[in-house]
């Protein structure tokens, strides 16, 4: 008797888009009401932190993004981890020697909330080159949870993407590409502290606007598209236009830096970890693939 194994590569089951939820205005309004709760009120570099500087946050953000890319995390994991990081730093003075430990803990918590198979403590320790111990990660996990008051279900810009795209009359064959480009813009914004105090809905609409105009995916003019997006998100047209211009400027700066420096080596991968196929949902495409 022969046994036939029909199991393929393990894929997480995913629910399809629900048009009734996406089209229900109450869902969007609920997110808009909640988003301000999770946005830092002021620059913690001026009010709270003494050792940590903006460039340190940026270096940490790039490392966290590389780890999420290497582990093919869901698109929401990295921005959510950065949200935890900013909220923690906005209320707790932290030494720069503890910054990587804090970033690893934030990724651990975000993956537990948004990932089907969350990151493990052992893998995160390897990515820190064992500068962080499992005991430290567990202790700091409890510490960060307490400082965040266990409120981890933060509203982030990714939560608005599907709702906004559903309300735009985009060709069906361009929707997926626009979404992927917008996700890359969101990841770029998460690495830049300039956007930390922007409402997630504004970052989402600005990213979609930049993606649509860059791809030429909509027949409407830029001003008409901005007015439409501002009406969907309930924000001022001028504020949204300024946000979109800032996102495009951040992209140009990132491309300029990428052209001047050689690609950084990938973070150390845990032994025995297997790479997953390109069909697996992963963090957004590289920023160099974006065209304005």
UniProtKB/Swiss-Prot annotation:
Q: What is its main location?
A: nucleus
GO cellular component terms listed in the entry, alphabetical order: cyclin-dependent protein kinase holoenzyme complex; cytoplasm; microtubule organizing center; nucleus
Q: Which InterPro entries match?
A: Cyclin, Cyclin-like_dom, Cyclin-like_sf, Cyclin_C-dom, Cyclin_N, Cyclins_cyclin-box
Annotated Cyclin N-terminal domain residues: 27-152
Where do the record's region annotations for Disordered lie?
255-292
- The species this protein belongs to is Bos taurus (Bovine)
Coiled-coil regions, chain positions: none
- What is the protein's given name? G1/S-specific cyclin-D3
